[in-house]
Structures are given as structure tokens and as C-alpha cells.
Amino acid sequence: MTRADTRSAEPVGRPWYVSALVAVLAALLLLGGVWVYTRIRSPFPYYGTVYDAPQQAAGVSGLSFTGGKVTPYAFTPGEGKTTAVFFGFTHCPDVCPATLAYLERARQAMTPAERAKFQVVFVSLDPDRDTPQRLNDYAKYFGDARSVQVKEPVLATLARSYAVSYVKAPLPGGGYQINHTSATFLIDAAGKKRLLWDVTQLGETARVLRDIRQVMNTPGNT
């Protein structure tokens, strides 16, 4: 009588290129899923960082310098203009001047009709030194931004509503600078925060302008 061989069969090795192909296909499926998910969340491929859902923006109330005198100023989100809001200070050595210059470059690239529907609001994080007149002189050097002095404690509340942090940092030999969040917030004509850019992104004028135009054309949407 013949006895059956009870030894388990040796596993057959899979060629390396088959394993590589399986790994590539798995990676492609994963990337495809990520791409579909991001397109569902935001069908338009924004350059800036998009809010998961548009958030109501906080208004800005303070003092500005216009017509040769200090006057009250209020930015009320939802009054019909697409608005870029940036928090900084006039003694800033790099981030603030770069941000204002980049935003002006994007504004200049717009059509006259687009410029009429767009504004930049520059909020000082250093109200002790940044008087309304100093702010106006500083902002106008870079372009057409409206600069605003907001006093404490209102400033702290406003900054928190935009998730902006800031702190005084002493300088060697005296004085101080303000360390702060370097984001610029884009608010649509319906008053919703739609996206933000970091200063490192703002130099890409064409891509920034593309974001602005999309937000202009879709107020209240994503």
C-alpha cells in the first residue's frame, strides 16, 4: 500500500517584479483616494490653505488716518468686498513689508473692476508704537492697504478670533519686536473666512491671484 506524503508543500516564491508592481498599485490607489477626498472637500484646487468650512470672519474696529486726520474705522465682513486681512507691525524687519508688497503685486495684476471689489486691511499688533499716522505712512509705501490701530484688550480678542498669536520679544540693547503669526486671511464678500496664505506662499502672484478670483466669484461657498 502506498502511503501518502504528509509533508507540506514548499511555498513558491513570488518574483520581485510582481511584488514591486503590487506595491506600486497600492500606492497609486492610496494617492488616488487622497486626491478624490481633497477634491470632494474643495473641488477648486486652491493654492492657499482652505478652511474645512467657511467661517464667519470677525470685524475690525479701530483708528485709521485718512484725509489728514485720525478717524474711526470699521471693517464689517459681508459688506461686499473680498478682503485680505494681515496682522503685523511697522517695526517688522521682513515678514510685514514682504506681505504688504506681495499683496499689492497681486492687486496690481487685477483688472480695474476686480480692484474695486478687493481690499487689504493691515491690523497693527503694536498699538503702543504704531500710531494711525505712522501706520498710514508705512502701509502706503507698499501699496493701497488700509491700516488700523486697535487698542488692547480689543486687539487680543480680535487676534484670537483669527488664531493669530503675538508676543513682545526684547531686543539686545533695548527695545522690542513682535513675534507673530505670519498668515494672511482671505475673506469673501459674504464675510466668510475662506483660506489663508503664509508669507512664503505670497510671492507666487499668479497662484495667489487665482485664489482671489475664485473666492470673488463664489462668495459663501468653498
Language-model features: locations:
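Structural microenvironment flanking redox-active thiols in thiol-disulfide oxidoreductases
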Residues: 98-158
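Generic structural signal for well-ordered beta-strand positions
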Residues: 70-73, 194-195
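Short active-site neighborhood of thiol/selenol oxidoreductases, capturing the structured segment around
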Residues: 73-103
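Short loop/turn microsegments at loop-to-beta-strand junctions
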Residues: 57-58, 82-83, 181-183
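Short, acidic, Ser/Thr-enriched surface-loop or helix-capping motifs
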Residues: 64-66, 188
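Thiol-/selenol-based redox modules, centered on thioredoxin-like
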Residues: 173-222
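Structural micro-motif
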Residues: 143-146, 156, 160-169, 179-185
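N-terminal targeting signals for export/organelle localization
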Residues: 1-61, 218, 222
